[in-house]
């Protein structure tokens, strides 16, 4: 089951990237789908092309930057709106909220950011740092349990 990620950035790449994550004796395919910008569902950027790729995924990962001018909550709402405007079925998919770049924020800000999502009873909320590796293993463990069990 492919997993989809989407960054909430105004700067976007030109094509999706596929990768395989090996986990224990199993593996799964991930698809990094860039280009989901505001207005993507109306054809802005490369949005429609990329949104079609998302339709084929099993689990969505919303990668939201902790160290950004746009709050993680607003990033999430914008991405969710674009998905819903393209297809309501996308909003029915299981998803993860992954707050990235947590190495760039203090503990109090991290706590408040994650609590915002937890207060809304989202089950799959993780924070990671690609630089330090913090939280990455826990995220992979959880995704793998969902896929392989």
Place the predicted regions along the sequence by residue.
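Single conserved hydrophobic/aromatic residue that forms the stacking wall/gate
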Residues: 1-12
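Canonical P-loop GTPase G-domain recognition
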Residues: 105-149
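Conserved RecA-like P-loop NTPase ATPase core
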Residues: 32, 50, 79, 139
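Phosphate-binding active sites in nucleotide-utilizing proteins
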Residues: 16, 43, 58
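Switch II (G3) loop of P-loop NTPases
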Residues: 9, 27-47
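AAA+/P-loop NTPase substrate/partner-engagement loops
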Residues: 10-27
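Conserved C-terminal guanine-recognition region of P-loop GTPase G domains, centered on the G4
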Residues: 51-124
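Conserved nucleotide-binding/hydrolysis micro-motifs of P-loop NTPases
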Residues: 18-20, 35-37, 66-70, 101-105, ...
